[in-house]
Protein backbone atom coordinates (compact mmCIF):
# COMPACT_ATOMS: atom_id res chain seq x y z
CA UNK A 1 0.00 0.00 0.00
CA UNK A 2 2.83 2.39 0.90
CA UNK A 3 4.52 1.63 -2.43
CA UNK A 4 1.33 2.60 -4.27
CA UNK A 5 1.10 5.90 -2.34
CA UNK A 6 4.71 6.69 -3.20
CA UNK A 7 4.02 5.96 -6.87
CA UNK A 8 1.00 8.28 -6.82
CA UNK A 9 3.05 11.00 -5.09
CA UNK A 10 5.85 10.68 -7.66
CA UNK A 11 3.32 10.84 -10.50
CA UNK A 12 1.63 13.90 -8.98
CA UNK A 13 5.02 15.58 -8.53
CA UNK A 14 5.95 14.85 -12.14
CA UNK A 15 2.64 16.27 -13.39
CA UNK A 16 3.09 19.44 -11.33
CA UNK A 17 6.68 19.85 -12.55
CA UNK A 18 5.68 19.29 -16.17
CA UNK A 19 2.79 21.74 -15.87
CA UNK A 20 5.04 24.45 -14.45
CA UNK A 21 7.63 23.87 -17.18
CA UNK A 22 4.93 24.10 -19.87
CA UNK A 23 3.49 27.27 -18.35
CA UNK A 24 6.87 29.06 -18.32
CA UNK A 25 8.32 27.57 -21.52
CA UNK A 26 6.87 30.32 -23.70
CA UNK A 27 8.21 33.72 -22.69
CA UNK A 28 7.55 36.72 -24.86
CA UNK A 29 10.45 38.99 -25.83
CA UNK A 30 10.18 42.74 -25.17
CA UNK A 31 7.83 44.59 -27.48
CA UNK A 32 4.24 45.79 -27.64
CA UNK A 33 2.16 43.18 -25.86
CA UNK A 34 -1.37 42.36 -27.03
CA UNK A 35 -3.69 39.78 -25.47
CA UNK A 36 -6.67 37.76 -26.65
CA UNK A 37 -8.58 35.03 -24.86
CA UNK A 38 -6.26 32.25 -26.04
CA UNK A 39 -3.09 34.03 -27.15
CA UNK A 40 -0.49 36.56 -25.99
CA UNK A 41 1.69 38.28 -28.56
CA UNK A 42 4.59 40.68 -28.51
CA UNK A 43 5.52 42.61 -31.63
CA UNK A 44 8.20 45.13 -32.52
CA UNK A 45 9.25 47.00 -35.63
CA UNK A 46 12.61 47.53 -37.27
CA UNK A 47 13.39 50.38 -37.13
CA UNK A 48 11.70 50.89 -33.76
CA UNK A 49 10.18 54.24 -34.80
CA UNK A 50 7.88 54.01 -37.81
CA UNK A 51 8.24 56.96 -40.20
CA UNK A 52 5.68 57.99 -42.81
CA UNK A 53 6.65 56.77 -46.27
CA UNK A 54 9.51 54.59 -45.01
CA UNK A 55 9.44 50.77 -45.20
CA UNK A 56 9.76 48.79 -41.99
CA UNK A 57 9.87 45.20 -40.82
CA UNK A 58 7.58 43.76 -38.17
CA UNK A 59 8.52 40.81 -35.97
CA UNK A 60 6.06 39.00 -33.74
CA UNK A 61 6.25 36.29 -31.10
CA UNK A 62 3.13 34.44 -29.94
CA UNK A 63 2.49 32.36 -26.83
CA UNK A 64 -0.65 30.28 -26.43
CA UNK A 65 -2.52 30.50 -23.13
CA UNK A 66 -3.45 26.84 -23.49
CA UNK A 67 -1.49 23.74 -24.41
CA UNK A 68 -2.42 24.17 -28.09
CA UNK A 69 0.47 25.05 -30.42
CA UNK A 70 0.64 28.44 -32.13
CA UNK A 71 -0.89 28.22 -35.60
CA UNK A 72 1.38 29.04 -38.53
CA UNK A 73 -1.72 30.11 -40.47
CA UNK A 74 -1.28 33.85 -40.03
CA UNK A 75 -2.11 37.12 -41.72
CA UNK A 76 -0.82 40.53 -40.66
CA UNK A 77 -2.23 43.80 -42.00
CA UNK A 78 -2.90 47.41 -41.04
CA UNK A 79 -5.55 49.99 -41.87
CA UNK A 80 -6.62 53.52 -40.99
CA UNK A 81 -10.07 53.29 -39.36
CA UNK A 82 -10.86 57.01 -39.71
CA UNK A 83 -10.02 56.98 -43.43
CA UNK A 84 -11.49 53.52 -44.08
CA UNK A 85 -8.53 52.28 -46.08
CA UNK A 86 -5.45 50.18 -45.56
CA UNK A 87 -1.92 50.07 -46.82
CA UNK A 88 -1.04 50.25 -50.49
CA UNK A 89 1.19 47.20 -50.03
CA UNK A 90 0.66 43.56 -49.13
CA UNK A 91 2.84 42.24 -46.33
CA UNK A 92 4.71 38.96 -46.48
CA UNK A 93 4.84 36.85 -43.30
CA UNK A 94 7.42 34.11 -42.81
CA UNK A 95 7.00 31.65 -39.90
CA UNK A 96 10.34 31.32 -38.09
CA UNK A 97 9.25 28.45 -35.82
CA UNK A 98 8.50 28.43 -32.13
CA UNK A 99 5.64 30.92 -32.48
CA UNK A 100 7.84 33.60 -34.08
CA UNK A 101 7.15 35.41 -37.33
CA UNK A 102 9.07 37.83 -39.57
CA UNK A 103 7.04 40.18 -41.76
CA UNK A 104 8.18 42.52 -44.54
CA UNK A 105 6.42 44.87 -46.93
CA UNK A 106 5.16 47.39 -44.36
CA UNK A 107 4.85 51.06 -45.31
CA UNK A 108 2.47 53.62 -43.83
CA UNK A 109 1.97 56.15 -46.61
CA UNK A 110 0.30 58.86 -44.50
CA UNK A 111 0.29 60.15 -40.92
CA UNK A 112 -2.53 59.39 -38.49
CA UNK A 113 -3.90 56.48 -36.51
CA UNK A 114 -3.10 53.06 -37.93
CA UNK A 115 -4.48 49.83 -36.57
CA UNK A 116 -2.40 46.66 -36.83
CA UNK A 117 -4.38 43.46 -37.27
CA UNK A 118 -2.79 40.13 -36.43
CA UNK A 119 -4.72 36.99 -37.40
CA UNK A 120 -3.06 33.93 -35.86
CA UNK A 121 -5.11 30.81 -36.48
CA UNK A 122 -8.60 31.70 -35.23
CA UNK A 123 -7.41 34.54 -32.99
CA UNK A 124 -7.76 38.15 -34.14
CA UNK A 125 -5.71 40.76 -32.28
CA UNK A 126 -5.49 44.49 -32.97
CA UNK A 127 -3.36 47.35 -31.73
CA UNK A 128 -3.47 51.04 -32.70
CA UNK A 129 -0.48 53.32 -33.25
CA UNK A 130 -0.29 57.00 -34.16
CA UNK A 131 2.22 57.92 -36.86
CA UNK A 132 3.27 61.57 -37.19
PLM region spans:
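Bacterial N-terminal signal peptides that target proteins for export
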Residues: 2-12
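Bacterial N-terminal signal peptides
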Residues: 12-22
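Contiguous segments within soluble domain cores/interaction surfaces
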Residues: 25-132
Amino acid sequence: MEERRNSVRRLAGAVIALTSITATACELPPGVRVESERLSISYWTIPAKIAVGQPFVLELAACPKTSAPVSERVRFDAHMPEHRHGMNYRTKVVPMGGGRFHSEGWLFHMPGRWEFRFDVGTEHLTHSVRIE
